[in-house]
């Protein structure tokens, strides 16, 4: 996870925050983060607009002023994402997985639809498999292919899903899913529909479908788009 955070700290974006959520892990996650980023507990008011499991502590980094860490009781991925939304301060938020590594221009490119069209409520980017690639200090330095046949099939499937399926659905405003590994949402819209739900397996797809339903029933103009 430290490598993923380092990749986020190197994003070429003018103003952003990083909120890491430790979902009641029983390993040394918090200890590793404390050591790597010199974290210290910081009492901070946190919105409760979305219900979540109990927040144990909120940490700030003395090395990076835009990095905060939430330590909470276990509640699952959806619950953790809601906790991050509650603490976030900007009108847009980006959700990624703990093992996601973003290219320096990823955030800037994925935010562009919001700048081009004020109706945009969500934007998804392309996710690719890093098996066979080289990652140094949170940065992708060499692109390669894995030797495992199943991993190769997975790469082909990801290319099909993102560069064929989503490219076709996006112009029709019919995107049914934005990958939980990399997606940007308008916070107001997500909070209005109740955030992520913990009682479903595919919380990323369920949220997108719920946004479609809410905005269509309300006859509100909106866009949910994909950036290749």
Predicted feature locations:
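A conserved acidic beta->alpha catalytic loop
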Residues: 22-42
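Acidic donor-binding/catalytic loop of UDP-sugar-dependent glycosyltransferases
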Residues: 28, 32, 98-113
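Short aromatic/hydrophobic "clamp" motif used to bind/position activated sugar donors
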Residues: 93
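Short, acidic, metal-binding catalytic loop of nucleotide-sugar glycosyltransferases
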Residues: 5-15, 35-43
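Conserved short acidic donor-positioning loop in nucleotide-sugar-dependent glycosyltransferases
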Residues: 8, 23-24, 75
